[in-house]
Amino acid sequence: MSTEGGFGGTSSSDAQQSLQSFWPRVMEEIRNLTVKDFRVQELPLARIKKIMKLDEDVKMISAEAPVLFAKAAQIFITELTLRAWIHTEDNKRRTLQRNDIAMAITKFDQFDFLIDIVPRDELKPPKRQEEVRQSVTPAEPVQYYFTLAQQPTAVQVQGQQQGQQTTSSTTTIQPGQIIIAQPQQGQTTPVTMQVGEGQQVQIVQAQPQGQAQQTQSGTGQTMQVMQQIITNTGEIQQIPVQLNAGQLQYIRLAQPVSGTQVVQGQIQTLATNAQQITQTEVQQGQQQFSQFTDGQQLYQIQQVTMPAGQDLAQPMFIQSANQPSDGQTPQVTGD
């Protein structure tokens, strides 16, 4: 082996001094070898023989060949270690690292065949830590079911179109809630109400032009006042209310001469307290309010005036301000 291409300089470190005297010392040991020295080797001969047999061209191995290979490998390892230790001392460290061996291989041409086996760490691109990406699936829409503190009241509205089948829909409302109903063109919608105890809901829907109300009172006809009573079982009973002649005359006088009035989409929700009345009206034209008293009850007539020239049927509802405790609502219909 040649010592050309080694480290230069006049450094007096222990590793450099050992390297300078390495080959003269090795040559002296080889000259002084005897037969006894070949019997004991620092490297295991069996492993060397196994490596030699990996070559398919090798048929037989002589007894001296493994001994020579073991001695040569020992010298090679010692020289490489000394050159790596020089790099360790230059970095002021006391521990031999893999990077030191890689630097020794790079700086010495004789060890070029080991560059691919022992690469330098700094020549490697830094390993990026792979970020663990957890695939998050979109959460499916979750349906929440909850119950309000107040027990809801079901209102069932049944509508029947002219010449079509009957369809029904159920709406749940809370106490004090207001619903606005708008009739469709050419549709007559009778309303069925189911309310709980202590709450009254009145739904009024106007009929389109050309259709008659269920109860009509024209010229020369009598007017009948119906009172709705809701029983404990939820059934609605209509009981005729007897009014005196003065009250009927007052109601007739409150009606306009020509049938040009209509109430559209009016819903009145009466709270449990008879003094609180919430009204929402969808209307056209002007409104007229008339009131009359019968003893301790106050009746209110609400009307909407439409432009002249429109012959529309007129529903009229009378609401009593003094609501009875059993949830009764007087109602008057006419045109």
Curated annotation (Swiss-Prot):
Compartmental location: Nucleus
Cross-referenced InterPro entries: Histone-fold, Histone_H2A/H2B/H3, Transcr_DNA_Rep_Reg
CDD domains: HFD_NFYC-like (cd22908)
Record key words, sorted: Activator, DNA-binding, Nucleus, Transcription, Transcription regulation
Superkingdom, taxonomy of origin: Eukaryota
Primary location class: nucleus
Keyword Nucleus in record: yes
GO terms (BP aspect): positive regulation of DNA-templated transcription; positive regulation of transcription by RNA polymerase II
Any Gene Ontology CC annotation: CCAAT-binding factor complex
One annotated GO molecular function: DNA-binding transcription factor activity
Pfam families hit by this protein: Histone
Function field: Component of the sequence-specific heterotrimeric transcription factor (NF-Y) which specifically recognizes a 5'-CCAAT-3' box motif found in the promoters of its target genes. NF-Y can function as both an activator and a repressor, depending on its interacting cofactors.
Quaternary structure and partners: Heterotrimeric transcription factor composed of three components, NF-YA, NF-YB and NF-YC. NF-YB and NF-YC must interact and dimerize for NF-YA association and DNA binding.
UniProt similarity note: Belongs to the NFYC/HAP5 subunit family.
Protein name per Swiss-Prot or TrEMBL: Nuclear transcription factor Y subunit gamma
This protein's encoding gene: Nfyc
